[in-house]
């Protein structure tokens, strides 16, 4: 049991199922998945390609909806929200970091960081203030005026992290954030996530890498749409065989 065991649940998935129909066949991307992620946790969700981890992230990030089951974000049932309401939730509560950075090439680092604040209607002066602060936090204040093509891969990912932090979200969802980076730069990005978690951010990291997952405080394995909680840093990773229901109870 981790020190976050009694913290408030941020994400609660209950018996979530997501089915795709491909070539006339039914594919269960998620099969009665149940889990709870609490405030202040640093959780890695690990699985191979096709395991369902991207579908899981999309549902947790309000980018997709389940076919059945219940999803609570900060205690609120997501299924009852409209598309516009879900967009507002994504913008205010969740910061996204993607493998491919997803930076706009014609904009500077600072302008890229300001984008989600524009959608929130934040004033230009406040946008400049906030973007400068988060770029400082990720160590890129001196690169604020540089465009993505003038930055290394690691620097681009730091800009992406800064953009995710700009709206001051409670939750960071990172999808393979080290996947396009060399090992040294990947370690630097993981160190940054650890620092953010120590500062209180709840972080969910999607990865196929055992080494990357080991740096999280808790690890959840997904295989063929089934979720298994592998426990905290004191548990031998990958050995726990926990049912989806049990995973939710023990989280």
Q: What is each PLM-predicted segment?
A:
Residues 190, 212, 228, 236-237:
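Flexible, glycine-rich phosphate/dinucleotide-binding loops
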Residues 219-232:
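H-loop (His-switch) and adjacent beta-strand-loop-beta switch element
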Residues 9-222:
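ABC family nucleotide-binding domain
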Residues 1-19, 229-251:
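ABC-family P-loop ATPase nucleotide-binding domain
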